[in-house]
A protein has these predicted regions:
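Acidic/His-rich structured neighborhood in mature extracellular/periplasmic domains
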Residues: 103-118, 163-168, 172-176, 186-190
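Catalytic cores and adjacent binding grooves of peptidoglycan-active enzymes
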Residues: 169-178, 182-286
Length: 286
């Protein structure tokens, strides 16, 4: 008897599962979506023309974004070149230089650097000829590479320490009118920088129509001490010094470099010449 009851219960198990499965299917078959009929939809007519508007909006005008404070001192991707970049490269840490002259051994000591003297003065303010600053910033922007000034202003002590030859004692580094430099990443391509300098005078509006500034000539005399004939216009004199030329204490690197001298002062409309009073008596000593 007990065995028959167990057998009947086992036979009923599949039937129970069938009933549960059926209930599950029927409960999921109903849809929750409501059916919309055309009569239940409403609309609203628009009573205006396409050009009509309730709010008058002024036409948009392009306004150039103001520069951030830190951007004002940028020249391309690098800090803007100022007169401070031209400070004398001398330092009292440099060793004494011994130079054998015809009759004696001469000792040359370097200056104390910017901590001991100022740049040249104009109207009692430190001064470097603006064309040098403008040119170097222009090069830095156009190339997006750093301009390295190897020699800007030289005080008399540093000047003779760098090069004691008599002819070097009358250069325009002494009066803030000359600069030696190269461009990082273009050290061995100075011709590209020369082309940029020539183009500068074509692009700047203030030189437009001024033939003496826009046209460069080549210096034909043999006293330039370089193998490449220099370029010049009314304002500047440009020299290419190859890596086998023009080495001194400030230019001990192995690259060719460029030298720009100022010939003409745009502001005063006068030629720029070396003078002893400017070189030796026109800067502060501390």
């Amino acid at each position: 008897m007990f065995q028959v009851i167990i057998a009947n219960k086992l036979n009923l198990l599949p039937l129970k599962f069938l009933v549960i499965f059926f209930i599950f299917l029927t409960s999921c078959s109903s849809s929750s979506k409501s059916t919309a009929t055309p009569s239940s939809l409403t609309g609203e007519y628009i009573y205006r023309h396409h050009e009509d508007s309730q709010i008058q909006v002024e036409p948009m005008i392009f306004v150039k974004r103001k520069t951030y404070p830190w951007e004002e001192n940028q020249s391309g991707a690098y800090p803007k070149i100022t007169k401070d970049f031209f400070r004398c490269k001398g330092t009292s840490l440099n060793p004494v230089r011994l130079v054998q002259k015809e009759k004696e051994l001469v000792r040359y000591y370097d200056c104390g650097g910017p901590q001991k003297h100022s740049l040249p003065l104009k109207n009692q303010k430190e001064f470097i000829y603006p064309i040098l600053i403008d040119l170097l910033n222009y090069i830095q922007v156009k190339t997006n590479k750093r301009v390295v000034i190897t020699c800007g202003h030289c005080c008399p002590d540093h000047n003779v320490y760098v090069d004691s030859s008599p002819s070097y004692q009358f250069n325009k580094h002494l009066i803030g009118a000359e600069v030696d430099f190269y461009v990082q990443g273009l050290e061995y391509q100075p011709e590209k920088i020369i082309e940029l300098i020539l183009n500068y005078y074509q692009e700047m509006p203030k030189y437009k129509g001024l033939k003496d500034f826009q046209e460069f000539k080549r210096y034909e005399k043999g006293d330039s001490k370089v193998s490449t004939k220099p370029w010049y216009n009314q304002e500047i004199f440009l020299k290419l010094i190859k890596k086998s030329e023009g080495r001194d204490f400030d230019n001990r690197h192995s690259y060719p470099y460029l030298c720009v001298q100022v010939r003409y002062d745009w502001e005063t409309k006068q030629k720029v010449h070396y003078s002893w009073s400017q070189a030796f008596g026109n800067f502060h000593r501390w």
